[in-house]
Amino acid sequence: MLIARVTIMKALFIAALLMLMMSAPARADPPKLAVFDFELIDTSLEGEVNGPRTDEHDRLMQAGDQVRRELAESARFQLLDIAPVNAAAHGSNLQACGGCDVQYAQRLGADLAITGVVQKVSNLILNITIYLRDVHTGDLVTAVNTDLRGNTSESWSRAVRYLVRNRLLAPNYGAPQPQ
């Protein structure tokens, strides 16, 4: 009798557990995200006189890689490989091309697209802006930015880390919640 009661209790527990699991909402797949390489707008006198610097070009590539890596690690996005459109993207001015970033992201099957711009005012004063767009509508979801001091790999990395952790991964992408 005791064995039958324990068996019935186990069966009821398993049935209840199965019902709970089946009634739980299904998790949607994370949105597909294309993160393009960052671009530089150099308004400094140094840039006008000396032209492009290889260390800044390297930092631009590292910034895009860092955004991709940190967003992939968050598991909130499914990162897409931009290689199929990368050459075309590099031939465009993504931050001012009238939506070509969205078109490239559509070709990849993305839901969202990120572009980034570093504006160099001087070798001391820079600004990083990251734009997140809805690929289906072309609408800007958010634009996040920060100023940084010092044109070093460390300062760029810290600025990117701040924007990803405190803005892009924040609820509502860091924007105030509607009341």
Language-model features, listed with the residues they occupy:
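N-terminal secretory signal peptides that target proteins for export/translocation
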Residues: 1-9
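Bacterial N-terminal signal peptides
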Residues: 12-21
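N-terminal signal peptide c-region/cleavage motif recognized by signal peptidases
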Residues: 23-25
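C-terminal/domain-edge helix-coil "capping" segments
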Residues: 28-45, 65, 73-74, 102-107, ...
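Second-shell loop/turn segments in exported
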Residues: 48-58, 90-91
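N-terminal, post-signal-peptide region of Sec/Tat-exported proteins
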Residues: 53-85
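Short, solvent-exposed, polar/charged sequence segments at loop or secondary-structure edges
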Residues: 72-115
